Every structure is written in structure tokens, then in C-alpha cells.
């Protein structure tokens, strides 16, 4: 039985992971960390940790783990450059799996969008993401991952070609432009569309999650896989072998 620690256990995702583990025959929720918890006790009770907290919470976790290595599955989004660099350096002494979206379907969407971007170089690319009205960051981490992915397929620097919105008389769309748009409303769990548009035809790749259990189950699958891996930085593609 794999003992899983939940970092950010009182949040939406932490709660969902706990529920999904209740019926799991291979793993159990053995430790819970939220504000006011003790890292030493938390680390001693688990074999692997799943983190869905905040950027600052994730940073604190990584700083402690550097001296107390433990396999980490990180699903927290909105990390800045410093925090990403901290994750990279920490992965030298422990296995870390980082994914902005733990859905297995989104992993396939990422793969398909890369192939489409590479093959359809004359097509314009537009990305649209939709989430609930309580989501704090925009664009979503998943949308940015998808954008980086399609830009990489065309050897483009995303920071130079990304557009976040359009208003007024802005002129003709540039050839390499990649738009990433965000909508917020209601209780939408998560929806992402990567569109490829050309004269006379277009292709749209869509993924929608209808339950947070989708992400929780993906994170648990990653934790089970990661606990037996060597030190290094992984993503969900490594877990799925795609």
C-alpha cells in the first residue's frame, strides 16, 4: 500500500483526492497538510506527496523537501520563474512530476495539438480556455502549456508571438501569432480548445472536464508511478509513456 500525503488538503483538489483514495486498493491518504501543519510529521507519514496548494505553498514544500527528499507530484499552477527554477534544482535529489493539468485526456490533447501544429504550418492557431468564476490565474496553466507546445512545434518563441486579447483597430493578424483567450463563469471545471484555421477549412481539438475527480485520479496515477522512479523532473507524458 502506497502512503500518499496531500499538500493543500483542505482545497478543492485536496478534498477530491482524499475522496478518490477512499476506494483505492493500491494507495491511501496517510497525511494531510494545510496552514498550520508541521512538515516533519507530514513527511514522516507518507511515501509520496501530491501538491495542490498555492505558488507560495509549493515553494515552501520544495524548500523543505530539498533537505528531506520525497517524491513530489506537483499540480499547483501560477508558479513564477524563481519557483520553477527551485523545482528544477530540487529534482536533482528527488523525483518530481510537474503537470499543469493532471487529466489523461489533456495529455492526449497536448500530443495531438503538437502534431497538428507541426503538420499544419499555414494554419492560424487560437487557444480558448474556460474555467469557473473563482479561478485566480489567467490564462490557465494548461492553456499556457498548450500554447508553449504548439509554439515549440513551429520553433517559435511564445513570448514574442502570444496575444492575450484584441480590441479596437489592431490591423491584420500576423502569420505566427498564437492567441490565448480566457473565459470565466459559473462552475466550469475546465475546458480547453486548440483551433487551427485556414482558408476553406479548420480543425478544433477540444477537451472538457466535468468533474474534479478527473484531475484527482490522474494525480493519483502519477503518484503511484513516481514513487518508483529515479531522481529527475518528469511530466504526465512520462507517466503515460507517450
UniProtKB/Swiss-Prot annotation:
Pathway: Amino-acid biosynthesis; L-lysine biosynthesis via DAP pathway; (S)-tetrahydrodipicolinate from L-aspartate: step 4/4. The active site is at residues 131, 135. InterPro entries: DapB_C (IPR022663), DapB_N (IPR000846), DapB_N_CS (IPR022664), DHDPR_bac (IPR023940), NAD(P)-bd_dom_sf (IPR036291). It comes from Campylobacter lari (strain RM2100 / D67 / ATCC BAA-1060). It is found in: Cytoplasm. This is 4-hydroxy-tetrahydrodipicolinate reductase. Pfam families: DapB_C, DapB_N. SUPFAM superfamilies: Glyceraldehyde-3-phosphate dehydrogenase-like, C-terminal domain, NAD(P)-binding Rossmann-fold domains. GO terms for cellular component: cytosol. One of its GO terms (molecular function) is NADP binding.
